């Protein structure tokens, strides 16, 4: 199962590499700026004292690989394209760069961050607020499913940073509730998700309304060639910090598969795992909203305490469920890919792919929920005969070997 992808596999790793190489070399080095400096401590980065206080209070001790290379060029006002896997402090990289450059005397929006989902936008807002706690930063998340009038009230009272989803942000700009005059930093987070799906036109529309001289940061866990191509229109000689696919191993997360003969037997396998393992907190991924509801009912009928969230639920319900999960009062969360990127919970030790993702790229976003910030994590993939091709695709895409679940899995958690 760990070998090459079977004939007819839907993912062509060689084609991906050749497209990426062609794209990156298409304009030689004229398109990019090189920036090779690495900073092994936050203290060496020349950051404001009160920003350092916020970074250390948040729990960071030393910078991750992407932070060592990515914070300073952003602080210097350079355009940047940065790729790093989930759980490596990517969000804190651009938050630090923004917080370092804000004029706190000016209570106008100076930085705009776009994210693909409400949950992720709200997570970024929390990180920005926490890191900027000693700086007095004012941040607001503009997302769908919330009161337009409340957004307008908060924006009119003055904020330094707006984080949001493209639809609501464009609406606020169109209504002139969000004024772009002082915006000097524009960040796209999870650019792969936004640029390769339906948000492309909205991002263009937003960009047209921003001042001509603006710093642009593009951050993502995966960077498809199509996403890089679009950034050319926005960016001026960006610094490129790319992690090759063979480095996207999600260090510290042990990855296993369990062979399940029939789809119907996955439920028994799942219940067996929960009865034998002592799990702090875990996330279970399935591929459809209907299956979230079905699996939640089945687990509860067997006396397992689980909570569930998916895109059909209203925003208030989703917020309450995520709050309970973050606080630890709920220990098992069942969800879909849609919400994978907004789940940032420190104590998650196990991710179970009840269904394998339909795209190799989404595997990274799912299993990056475990082992956050250097903690140990385990991911377990349920694999039927129909899933073998996708498992091979995932292994080739990330250049990893996913081994069969050992008998002593309890020792790994």
Curated annotation (Swiss-Prot):
Residues noted as binding ATP in the record, renumbered to the chain: 84-91
Pfam families noted in UniProt: DEAD, Helicase_C
Enzyme Commission number, as recorded: 3.6.4.13
GO MF annotation terms: ATP binding; ATP hydrolysis activity; RNA binding; RNA helicase activity; translation initiation factor activity
Superkingdom classification of source: Eukaryota
Coiled-coil region list: none
SMART domains in the cross-refs: DEXDc, HELICc
GO biological process per UniProt: cytoplasmic translational initiation
SUPFAM superfamilies in UniProt: P-loop containing nucleoside triphosphate hydrolases
Keyword Signal: no
Segments forming domain Helicase C-terminal: 252-413
Motif (DEAD box): 189-192
A GO term from the CC aspect: cytoplasmic stress granule
Short motif (Q motif): ranges: 40-68
InterPro entries the record matches: DEAD/DEAH_box_helicase_dom, Helicase_ATP-bd, Helicase_C-like, P-loop_NTPase, RNA-helicase_DEAD-box_CS, RNA_helicase_DEAD_Q_motif
Oligomeric form and interacting partners: eIF4F is a multi-subunit complex, the composition of which varies with external and internal environmental conditions. It is composed of at least EIF4A, EIF4E and EIF4G.
Family as reported in the entry's similarity comment: Belongs to the DEAD box helicase family. eIF4A subfamily.
Listed name of the protein: Eukaryotic initiation factor 4A-9
Organism (species): Nicotiana tabacum (Common tobacco)
Organism lineage: Eukaryota, Viridiplantae, Streptophyta, Embryophyta, Tracheophyta
